[in-house]
Amino acid sequence: MRHLLLATTAVAVVLGGTMAARADMAAAEKFLAEEINGLSVLSADEQKAEMQFFIDAAKPFTNLEIKVVSETIATHEYESKVLAPAFTAITGIKVTHDLIGEGDVVEKLQTQMQSGENIYDGYVNDSDLIGTHWRYQQVRNLTDWRAGEGKDVTLPTLDIADFIGTSFTTAPDGKLYQLPDQQFANLYWFRYDWFNDEQNKADFKAKYGYDLGVPVNWSAYQDIAEFFTGRDLSRLGVEGKVYGNMDYGKKDPSLGWRYTDAWMSMAGMGDKGEPNGLPVDEWGIRGNEGAQPTGSCVARGGATNSPAAVYAVEKAIEWLQKYSPPEAAGMPFGEAGPIPAQCNGAQQMFWYTAFTAATVKPDLPVMNEDGTPKWRMAPSPHGAYWSEGTKIGYQDAGSWTLMKSTPVDRAKAAWLYAQFVTSKTVDLKKADVGLTFIRESTINSDHFTERAPKLGGLIEFYRSPARVQWSPTGTNVPDYPKLAQLWWQNIGDAMSGAKTAQEALDSLCAAQESVLARLERAGVQGDLGPKLNEEKGADHWLAQPGSPKAKLENEKPKGQTIAYDELI
C-alpha cells in the first residue's frame, strides 16, 4: 500500500502541478491528523492512499458546485458540518450537504422523479424505496455504474463486501441500487436498573406470577407498562410520575413510519421470510411469484386491514393512552425520541438506535457516574400473531442514491463525496460520533469492543447474526412516496378517535389498492408493476395458510420474559 501511495503521489505531482497537489494533500493530511486522529480501521499509509485517490479522481471537477441532501440525524450533521468542508478542501469540489426532514427528502426525490429536473446531485434516501427504484429505473444502479460510467471515480478500496446493509439495497435483479451511509434499528429500550431492583422484582412476581425481565411477547410488555405506570420510585431517587410506555401519536408523516417500519410484522401480520415476508409483507401488500403486487385488503389476499393489523394498531393506541406521558400523543418522532433519556420512562418498545448518541451523554440522569448507562436495549417483543421466521423489527438504511436525471459530471462528483463519507478512512470516526453502523470492519474494531459497555447493548446487537431479522421495507412496495403518505393520514384518524382501527385500516388498504390500480392501468412499471387479484372475500383468504391470518380467540396469552444478562 505504501508503494501505491508513493506512486500515486508522484503521478499527481507530475500531472497536476506540484503546488496544487501539495495543497490538496496538505488539506488531506490536516484532516487525517486533526479529525481522524488515528480513529480508522486503516493504517496511516492506507488512509493517505485513499485521500490521494480522491485528490486525483476529483481533478476534472475542481470548483464544481454540487448539492446533496439527507435527513437530519447526528450522523448526517457530522457529514454536513465536518466531512463536507473537509472534502471540499481536499478535492476542490464544492459540496453543500443540506439537512431536511425525512419526509421532505422523499418529497424532493419524488419531484425529481416526476419532473426530470435535477434538484439534488445525490440523495441519502432510505432503502425503503428499493422496490420503487427497481421498478421505475430512474436511479443509476451502482453495479453497472461502478463497472462502467463511474469506474474512473470508484474508490479501489471501497470494499462493498464490508457493508452490512447491501442485501437491503440490492433488488431481485441482483443489482446494487444504493450505497448504505448509515443504519439504525428499532429495538426495545428499558431501565436496566429498575428491572434489577429487588423490590420491583418481588412486587412484579407477586402480581403477575412471572419474573420481571425483557419482555418476549406483547403481553409481558403490557404487564410491565401497567406495573410501572404511576409507581412510586422515590426510594430510587426518581422524582415525578413514572410511565410504563413511551411512544408518539401526532398526525404527521413520522406517524406513518411508526407503522410501516415493521410494527405490523412485529404484531405478526405478515408472512415468514428474510429480509421481508413473502408473499405478504409488513405493509400488508401481497406479491405474486413474479414480484407483482396483487392486493392490500384481505379480500384480495392482502393483510393491511386483517385482524392482526387491527390488533397492532389497537394495542399501540391503548398503550399510548394508558401508560404514556399525556404529551406523547401530540408528539412527532423527532420530539419523542430523546424522551427516555429524561429519566421517567420504564420502557419503550419502538426505540430507534439513532438516538443512542443522544442517550449516552454523561450528564444525563439515565447514566451512571462511571459512564455506563442505567438502561439497555434488547430485541423487541412480538405480538400474539407472530411466529418464528417472521420479521421481528425494522432497520433504517439511509443510502446514497444517484438519479439518472443528474448530469454525469455532477453524479460523478456526488459519488466521490458519497464514497468519502463511507470510506474505511472515515467510517470508524463517523460511527464514533453517530453510532449508525454500516461496515463490518467498524463494528468489529477494537475501538468498539472498548466502547461496548457504555453503549447499552448496541454493539452486541450489531455483532449478532440476528441483526438480519431487522430489515427495511422490501420490494413488494412499488411506489414508496405515493403509498407512504396514505399511512399517516389514515392511522392518524385511528389515533385521534375519528375512526376505529378497523375503519381506518379499511380506508388505508382501499387507498393503497387505488394507487396499485392506477399504476397497473398506467403500465409505467412494466412486468414488475401491480396486477391486482380479483376480490374473493375475506373468508376465502383467511382460510388459507399464512397471511392474512384469522382473528385469534385470545390476543393476550400469558406474558413471557427473559433476563437481560441471559439474553446477551
Predicted regions and their residues:
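Extracytoplasmic/periplasmic substrate-recognition and gating elements
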Residues: 170, 174, 321-324, 362-442, ...
